[in-house]
Design a protein with these regions (language model features):
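N-terminal secretory signal peptides that target proteins for export/translocation
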Residues: 1-14
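Hydrophobic alpha-helical transmembrane bundles of multi-pass membrane proteins
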Residues: 11-180
C-alpha cells in the first residue's frame, strides 16, 4: 500500500505523467482475493439469464396458459415471488443454505452466521468469484424454484397463501437441500 502511494506521488510530480500514474495504479493494485475474471463474467451472465427466465420468461409463459381474466394474477404472483424470495434469501436463506456448520455430522442447515448477509463482504470470495456474486447467482435459483411451482396451482390459490407456501418452501425445503 505504501509502495503504491509512493509511486503515485512520484509520478504526479513529473509533468504530464497522469497516464503513467494511472497505469501504475492499475498494475500495482490488486483485489484482496484471487478472482477469476472469466469465471466471474460467466457467473454474471448466468445470473442474468436465470433471472430473465423468471421475469419475464416464466411469468409470460404462465400468463399464456391461463384464462384472460387470470393473466394479471399470474404475472403478479411471479413478480411478487421474485421480490419476496429475494428478500427472504438475503435475510436467512443464504445463511441456511451456505452457512458453515463446522465438523458436526448430521447438521441439516447451516449456521446463522450470515443472517442479513452479515459476514459477506466485498473482499470475500467463493470458488474464485466475489461472494456477493455467488449470493446473487444462488438467489436466482431460490427465486425460480417457487415460481416454477406457480404453474401447478395457477388460478387455484389465493395470493397470500401462495406467498406463505413459497416462503415455507424456500426456508424448509430448498435452503436445507442446498446445504446438503
Amino acid at each position: 500500500q505504501s509502495f503504491l502511494s509512493g509511486v503515485f506521488i512520484v509520478l504526479n510530480f513529473v509533468k504530464g505523467a497522469r497516464l503513467p500514474s494511472m497505469i501504475a495504479l492499475a498494475l500495482f493494485s490488486a483485489p484482496s482475493f484471487a478472482s477469476d475474471t472469466g469465471h466471474t463474467a460467466w457467473m454474471l451472465t448466468a445470473t442474468a439469464l436465470v433471472l430473465f427466465m423468471t421475469i419475464p420468461g416464466l411469468s409470460l409463459f404462465y400468463a399464456g396458459l391461463v384464462r384472460a381474466k387470470n393473466v394479471l394474477s399470474v404475472l403478479m404472483q411471479c413478480f411478487a415471488i421474485t421480490g419476496f424470495m429475494s428478500l427472504l434469501w438475503f435475510v436467512a436463506g443464504y445463511s441456511i443454505a451456505f452457512g458453515t456448520d463446522g465438523v458436526e455430522p448430521g447438521r441439516y442447515i447451516g449456521d446463522m452466521g450470515n443472517l442479513f448477509l452479515a459476514n459477506v463482504s466485498i473482499d470475500s470470495a467463493r470458488n474464485g468469484v466475489p461472494e456477493t456474486l455467488f449470493v446473487m447467482f444462488q438467489m436466482t435459483f431460490a427465486v425460480i424454484t417457487p415460481a416454477l411451482i406457480v404453474g401447478g396451482f395457477a388460478e387455484r390459490m389465493k395470493f397470500s397463501a401462495m406467498l406463505l407456501f413459497s416462503a415455507a418452501w424456500m426456508l424448509l425445503v430448498y435452503a436445507p437441500v442446498c446445504h446438503w
